[in-house]
Regions:
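Basic, flexible linker segments flanking DNA-binding modules
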Residues: 1-44, 150
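Mobile genetic element proteins and their domesticated derivatives, centered on retroelements
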Residues: 4, 36, 52, 83, ...
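RNase H-like two-metal-ion nuclease catalytic core shared by retroviral integrases
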Residues: 21-23, 27, 121-123, 129-130, ...
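An active-site-proximal beta-strand-loop segment
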Residues: 38-86, 92
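Active-site beta-loop-alpha junctions of metal-dependent nucleic acid enzymes
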Residues: 70-71, 88-112, 128
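Short small-residue beta-strand/loop micro-motif enriched in glycine and branched aliphatics
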Residues: 82-88, 143-146, 170-171
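Catalytic core of bacterial c-di-GMP phosphodiesterases, primarily the EAL and HD-GYP domains
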Residues: 114-118
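Active-site/catalytic core of tyrosine-dependent DNA strand-transfer enzymes
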Residues: 128-138
């Protein structure tokens, strides 16, 4: 650290400090128990699935010629067997419809699992909604949620977002939804 300071060097890819997107809106529906309890490993494909939402910004030119920030929301579903994204939705607003459509695709892709599946998320409002929890019950899928404010309970997904942003997002400026 001191050598870096003496030489006047600065690491740009770790210096971004912006407010992290939070989908938590209090208790708006059913909060499930933390069934995974940080046991992320599985030897069975499609048995344990985790999800979360992350926010990305892109910049468009405003009427006055100044850049205006716009947001994009990424909702992936990851199979914990080999850390593969099995479905996702990208939208300009955090929407239950987008999360629900990615959920439907994740249910379809993981339907070949011979054991009862577990879908894990944080306590975001979309994951507490009646339509979300009802859909999981219809498919006999266990719902698991992280404890409030504890990112370690979904650390695999948080790590994925960190790596993704490190590789393609931080240090770059995107000028359209399509470019990002």
């Amino acid at each position: 650290q001191r050598i870096v300071q003496k030489l006047g060097l600065q690491v740009h890819s770790f210096t971004h400090r912006t407010r992290k997107y939070s989908s938590y809106r209090g208790s708006v529906g059913t909060v499930a128990d933390n069934l995974l309890n940080r046991r992320f490993k599985t030897s069975i494909p499609h048995q344990k699935i985790t999800t979360d939402t992350s926010e990305f910004k892109y910049w468009l030119q405003g009427d006055d010629g100044k850049p205006v920030a716009h947001k994009l929301y990424f909702d992936p579903y990851m199979d914990l067997f080999h850390a593969e994204i099995v479905s996702f939705h990208i939208g300009q607003t955090p929407s239950a419809v987008g999360i629900q459509s990615a959920l439907e695709e994740a249910i379809r892709v993981t339907a070949d699992c011979p054991y009862r599946r577990t879908f894990h998320s944080d306590q975001g409002w979309a994951y507490q909604m009646k339509s979300y929890t009802k859909r999981l019950k219809e498919e006999r899928i266990f719902q698991s949620m992280s404890r409030k404010g504890n990112c370690l309970d979904n650390s695999v997904m948080e790590n994925f977002f960190g790596l993704l942003k490190q590789e393609i997002y931080y240090g770059r400026v995107y000028h359209s939804y399509e470019e990002l």
